[in-house]
Each structure stands twice: as structure tokens, then as C-alpha cells.
Amino acid sequence: MNIDLLRELEGEVLNFYQKKKMMGVSFLTGVLGVLIDLKPAALLINDKLNESKLLDNKRIMEILNKLGVDLVRERLNKFSNEEIEYLYLAKTARVCLELQKWHREFFNSVSESGEILDKKVWSEANYQIGKILGYPETATLEYIRMQIEGIEKDNNYRSRMERNYYYMHSARYENEEFEAYDLRLNLAVNEYLPVTAEIMQANTKKDG
């Protein structure tokens, strides 16, 4: 792991987001998760702020290339009038394209308003996306079940959302999922991205 390059990436990304640094945290933790082999791939967004996009900064692309990750882009605007450029990031182009394929399947399985049109296709797409993003299977399966069955989001659900930053944990296996994914990524953030770690800790204290 090239720590100097990672620290430079951290600086470039957080500088772009300025006061919206938690958006930069999402990008950086996604990249780091791929680099430490926790996630086969990351699904990110080429955000636009003040009329410029994150990857307009060519140095960010140079650093990502030097770190050994590949990137596939796709512009979609299904759920809003504003076009979003999605980034599929992995160590190989094959995995990037696999994530892109299932993300397209997901988009094709829902209406413009987000209503599920084909439950079977939607469920399989979400399962495969969760797998490629490295999320614990128990968490992905519970998310799918809640959406398909229309289970009401109670206080327990909201508490888990507040406690867990990266994805929606299941009620039964929350601790196991945290140890398998969150803890490993948190430790890597503390080691390689110190400014990002400080931002995450400050945000947690603010929410608390």
C-alpha cells in the first residue's frame, strides 16, 4: 500500500468537497475498501459541486491508476431530472463491468419513481450488487426482504442506521457483520486516512 499516494488522494478529494466532507469520506472509504481487498468493487458517484466534477481533477485519476484500480463510468438519470455519473471501481475492469451490469439490472427493475416492477430481477440485482460491494450476505438478504415485504422501518431499524455508517445491518447479525466488514474498514481508515478518520469521528459525536 502506497501511503503517500493515499494521503495525497485524501487531500485532493476532501479539498474538492470543502464543507461537504462527509461526501468525500464515502468516496475515500470506498476506494480504501477495494485496496485492502475487503470489497471486490465500490459503487461511487462523480459528484458535481460549483459547476465542476470530482474527476475533473486529473490528479485524482492519476493517483487511482497508480494505486492499481480501474474505473468504469456511466451516466444515468432515472430518478431525477439531474444526470448522475456513477463510478464502478475495482482492481480489474472485469469486476467493474460486472458491477455495472447488475446496477443496470437494478435500474431496469424499478420505475421512474423507484417502485419495484419485477421483484425477482430486483432481488437478484440487489443480491449481486451487495456481494460485489463486499457487504455481509445476512445484511443484504435482510435489506431485500424488508423492501419486498414492505416491512415498516421501526425505531430498531433507525437505530441501526445511525450506528452503522457503511450499509444497512441486519437486526440479528449486526455484531457479526460489524466485525466482518465495518471493523476492518475502520481500522484501515485509522491507519491510512487519518484526516478521514477524524471527520468520521467528529460526525459521529455530532449525531450523538
Spans of features found by a protein language model:
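An amphipathic, hydrophobic-aromatic interaction surface with interspersed Lys/Arg
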Residues: 123-130
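Internal, hydrophobic cores of structured domains that mediate oligomerization or house catalytic pockets
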Residues: 118-122
